[in-house]
Amino acid sequence: MEERESNVLGTAPIGRLMLKLAVPAVAAQFINMLYNIVDRIYIGHIPEAATLALTGLGVTFPIITLVSAFAAFAGQGGAPLAAIQLGAGKKDQAERILGNSLALLLMTAAVLTVGFSAFKEPILRAFGASDATIGYASSYIGIYLLGTVFVQLALGLNTFISAQGKAMTAMLSVLIGAVLNIVLDPIFIFVFQWGVRGAALATILSQAVSACWVLAFLCCPHSILRIRRAYVRPDPRVMGKIAGLGVAPFIMQSTESLVTVVLNTGMQTYGGALYVGSITIIQSIMQMIVMPTQGITQGVQPIMSYNYGAKNYRRVRQTFKRLLAVTMAVTCSAFVMVALIPGVLARIFTPEQELIQLVSRVMPLFFGGIWAFGAQMACQSTFMALGQARTSLSLALLRKVILLVPLALILPRVTGSVMGIYAAEPIADILASATTLTLFLSQRKKLLPTEKDAPKG
C-alpha cells in the first residue's frame, strides 16, 4: 500500500496531481500565515495602544523569522532528500533522514530558546525597539520563545508529511493550530486583557497542538515515513546532507530578519515612526501574497523530487512548466490587487487614517515588481527539489542580500527621500527574477536531459 501511494507521484496525471498536492499546501501556508497575521490584526486594534503595540510586535519579526528559518533548515533540508530516496525505492534511508531532521530540530530549539532569552532586550533594541516600544516587544517575544520547540517541530516535521504526498494531512496539521489561535487570540487579548502577552500565549499553545498532531501522524502506521527511535540518533553524514540542502531555505527565511531590520531602521531615520508602521503593514501584506505562492511550490516539490529520483526527467519538465505558469498567474494577480485596493488592505491592520493614507500611497510602488517574483519562486523551488544546494543558495542570496539590502541602504541616501527605500523592493524583484530564470534555462538541459540530449551508452 505504501509503495502504491508513493508511486502516485510518478504515475498520476500531472495537472490533477498538482491540484491535489498544491491546493492543500496553499491552504496550509495561508493558514500558517494566520498565526502572525491574526496577532497583528488584533494587536493593531488594542484600545489606546494600537500603534505602539503593533510597532513593538513588528520589532520582534526578525527573531520570529529566525526561529522559523531554523525549522526550514532541518525540515526543508531533509524532506526533499527523503522524497528522492523514496523515489529511488530506499525507504530506510528516507526514514533515517527523517530521524536526523527531528534530532536537528530538537537541538536547534534548545539553543535558540536559551540564546534569545538570555540576550532578549539588547537584541530587540538592535532590531529597532525604542523606549516606547521595548515593553511590548519584550512581553511578546519572552512568552513566544518558551514555545520555540513547538514551532520547530510543527513547521519542520510537517514538510515530511508533504514529502510523501499526503498534502491534506499536512494542511490539517496547520489548520488545527491556526483555528485554535484565531479563537484564543481575542479571548486572551481582550476578554482576559492580557494584551500582547495573550497574543503570544495563544500562538505557542496553538503551535503545541500542531506539533503533537504532526508527531502522532509520523509515528502511526498510516504514514509512509515513520519516526523510528534508532534513526533519531544523530548521524554526522546524514546531518551534513540535510544541512547542505537546508542552507538555502534557511537563508531565504533568515535574510527576512536582515531585511526587516534594514527597512525598520531606514524608515525611522528618513521618515519617522509613522513610516515604520507603514512598512510593518506592507510586510504583512507581502507575507499574505508570498506564503500562498510558497505553498504552491512546496506542494509541487514532491512530484519533481520523486520523478527526479526515478530519472523520469520528462515528467519533471512538464511539472516545472505548469508550476511556472501558476506562480506567474498568482503574482501578476497580486500586482493588480495592490494597485487597485491598497486602502482596503491597509484597513485590515489599522483604523488610523493617517497611516492608511500613507500605506495606500506607497504600496503600489513597493509591489511594483511582484508580478515577476513568480518566476524566481518557481525556479528556486525546482533547484531545491532537484537537490541543487549550491545553486539554491546562490539564488537565495541574490534577491535579498545582494540586491535588496544594498538598494535599501543606498537609494534613500542618493535620493534624499524615504521613498528610495520603498523603491528598492521592485528593483530587486525584477532583477532577481530575470537572473534566476535565465540561470535555470541555461542549466535545464544538463539537469533534465531529453532523450536526444542524454549521453549515449
Q: Can you say where each PLM-predicted feature lies in the sequence?
A:
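Transmembrane helical elements of multi-pass membrane transporters/channels
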Residues: 20-39, 143, 177, 206-210, ...
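Small-residue-rich hydrophobic transmembrane alpha-helices
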Residues: 54-114, 151-170, 278-342, 373-392
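N-terminal transmembrane alpha-helices
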Residues: 9-49, 62-77, 81, 85, ...
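Helix-terminus/linker motif at the lipid-water interface of multi-pass membrane proteins
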Residues: 30, 34-55, 124-131, 187-194, ...
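Small-residue hotspots at the loop-to-helix junctions and early N-terminal turns
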Residues: 51-62, 138-141, 200, 273-288, ...
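Residue-level signal for transmembrane alpha-helical positions in Major Facilitator Superfamily
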Residues: 19, 34-35, 62, 74, ...
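Short runs within selected transmembrane alpha-helices of multi-pass transporters and secretion channels
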Residues: 144-162, 170-178, 199-212, 294-297, ...
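Short alpha-helical transmembrane segments in multi-pass integral membrane proteins
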Residues: 1-22, 82-149, 191-247, 304-369, ...
